[in-house]
């Protein structure tokens, strides 16, 4: 759960955090007993706890398909991300990955921590994949093949132009959006979304991650991972790594804001995609990551900390998003709130200020035209200020009771 200091600063986070903790425990207890599926769901919770929680809410067959789809692509991504693997070894593996998923003896040792376990024990994923219905298998194979080919292309070339950047993000994330749309359609729960809208869903998430992970990627050992397009960063510095140096802070922030502005172009497509969804579980599955993305962009925008350390939404706000995202009006409300926060951070002297404001106003216009903004609680902005003293008192009472209980039950009795 969130730290005590964070909870005291944002007491309204306490209940959503508690609910999230209980939901996580419940999800862990729902892991199937069959060995291959037990491995897959256990691994899912290890590589992405919040994603694992949302997947669990899907219907049984779709849930299994999405779980395997996620793990297959996570394994493919682990190979691509491992900078210790030579190009000569890496390219054939990613190109043939769609074949490896049919081979229940295949594995390849790479990655670290839980990702290494996923790769070493990949036969569990392959066996579970083979249990899926044919329409699910065909969709997963097709996307894996196309993604592997795209990754191979960019292993051998750098991201130079914005078109390159969009193409790379299409291969590693836009195709995920296309694949999920195919799985939703195969389940009979949704109409097949257009490739354009599905692609934007993936690009919005991927570009957010690339922006947020600048420092981690540039400091990667033995070789930096560089995804920011030269067409953008070369306007501000001579080398991409120069952005992390303090003497370049002003230029670095301008470059960062340029990157965020580029990502915002996909927001309206994302709103359209989500507004077309019918199933509540699929809707939440899609909506929660998108809200997290625009929230993360709002935190990163105009923030030098992106070049100094980790920038991410606090756990309590994440818990609120997971707890309170139920309808499209919640999504419009969150996008409107975060676009307001972004708008408040725009410096009129920034070279991209006009373009940034234009894109934010377009998002706000779409949210307003939905006619639903008045129906939702604006928890994202309002809860940032002010302390609920009653809730703080309750938290201290609960902590006191817990302390008393632990003291009486765990400490040795005095004779």
UniProtKB/Swiss-Prot annotation:
Membrane association type: Multi-pass membrane protein
UniProt-recorded Gene Ontology molecular function terms: squalene synthase [NAD(P)H] activity
Subcellular location: Endoplasmic reticulum membrane
Swiss-Prot/TrEMBL catalytic activity: 2 (2E,6E)-farnesyl diphosphate + NADH + H(+) = squalene + 2 diphosphate + NAD(+); 2 (2E,6E)-farnesyl diphosphate + NADPH + H(+) = squalene + 2 diphosphate + NADP(+)
Listed transmembrane segments: 281-301, 391-411
InterPro entries reported for this sequence: Isoprenoid_synthase_dom_sf, Squ/phyt_synthse, Squal_synth-like, Squalene/phytoene_synthase_CS, Trans_IPPS_euk-type, Trans_IPPS_HH
PROSITE patterns: SQUALEN_PHYTOEN_SYN_1, SQUALEN_PHYTOEN_SYN_2
Pathway in which this enzyme or protein is active: Terpene metabolism; lanosterol biosynthesis; lanosterol from farnesyl diphosphate: step 1/3
EC numbers on record: 2.5.1.21
Keywords for this protein: Endoplasmic reticulum, Isoprene biosynthesis, Magnesium, Membrane, Multifunctional enzyme, NADP, Transferase, Transmembrane, Transmembrane helix
GO-annotated cellular components: endoplasmic reticulum membrane
UniProt keyword annotation of Amino-acid biosynthesis present: no
Major localisation: endoplasmic reticulum
Induction comment: Induced methyl jasmonate (MeJA) in adventitious roots. Induced by A.niger mycelium-derived elicitor, thus improving ginsenosides production in adventitious roots culture.
Role noted for this protein: Component of the triterpene saponins (e.g. ginsenosides or panaxosides) and phytosterols biosynthetic pathways. Catalyzes the biosynthesis of squalene.
Family: Belongs to the phytoene/squalene synthase family.
Name of the protein this chain belongs to: Squalene synthase 12
């Amino acid at each position: 759960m969130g730290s005590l200091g964070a909870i005291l600063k944002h007491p309204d986070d306490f209940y959503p955090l508690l609910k999230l903790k209980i939901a996580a425990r419940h999800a862990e207890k729902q892991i199937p007993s069959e060995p291959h599926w037990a491995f897959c769901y256990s691994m899912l919770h290890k590589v992405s706890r919040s994603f694992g929680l949302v997947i669990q809410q899907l219907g049984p067959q779709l849930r299994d398909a999405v779980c395997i789809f996620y793990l297959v692509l996570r394994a493919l991504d682990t190979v691509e991300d491992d900078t210790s693997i030579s190009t000569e070894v890496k390219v054939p593996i990613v190109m043939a990955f769609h074949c490896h998923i049919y081979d229940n003896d295949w594995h390849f040792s790479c990655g670290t921590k839980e990702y290494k376990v996923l790769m070493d024990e990949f036969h569990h994923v392959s066996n579970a994949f083979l249990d899926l219905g044919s329409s699910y298998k065909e969709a997963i194979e097709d996307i894996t093949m196309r993604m592997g080919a795209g990754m191979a292309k960019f292993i051998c070339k750098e991201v130079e132009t914005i078109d390159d950047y969009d193409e790379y993000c299409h291969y590693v994330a836009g195709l995920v959006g296309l694949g999920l749309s195919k799985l939703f359609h195969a389940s009979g729960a949704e109409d097949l979304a257009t490739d354009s809208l599905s692609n934007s869903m993936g690009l919005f998430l991927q570009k957010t991650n690339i922006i947020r992970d600048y420092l981690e990627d540039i400091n990667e050992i033995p070789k930096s991972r560089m995804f920011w397009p030269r067409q953008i960063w070369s306007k501000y510095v001579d080398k991409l790594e120069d952005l992390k140096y303090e003497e370049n802070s002003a230029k670095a922030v301008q470059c960062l804001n340029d990157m965020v502005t580029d990502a915002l172009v996909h927001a309206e497509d994302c709103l359209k995609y989500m507004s077309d969804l019918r199933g509540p579980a699929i809707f939440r599955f899609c909506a929660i990551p998108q809200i997290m993305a625009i929230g993360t962009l709002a935190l990163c925008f105009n923030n030098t900390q992106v070049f100094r350390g980790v920038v991410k939404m606090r756990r309590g706000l994440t818990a609120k998003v997971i707890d309170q995202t139920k309808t499209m009006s919640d999504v419009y409300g969150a996008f409107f709130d975060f676009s307001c926060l972004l708008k408040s951070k725009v410096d009129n002297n920034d070279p991209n200020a006009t373009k940034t404001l234009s894109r934010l106003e377009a998002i706000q216009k779409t949210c307003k035209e939905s006619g639903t903004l008045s129906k939702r609680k604006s928890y994202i902005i309002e809860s940032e200020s002010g302390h609920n003293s009653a809730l703080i008192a309750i938290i201290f009472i609960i902590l006191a009771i817990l302390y008393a209980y632990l003291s009486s039950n765990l400490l040795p009795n005095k004779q």
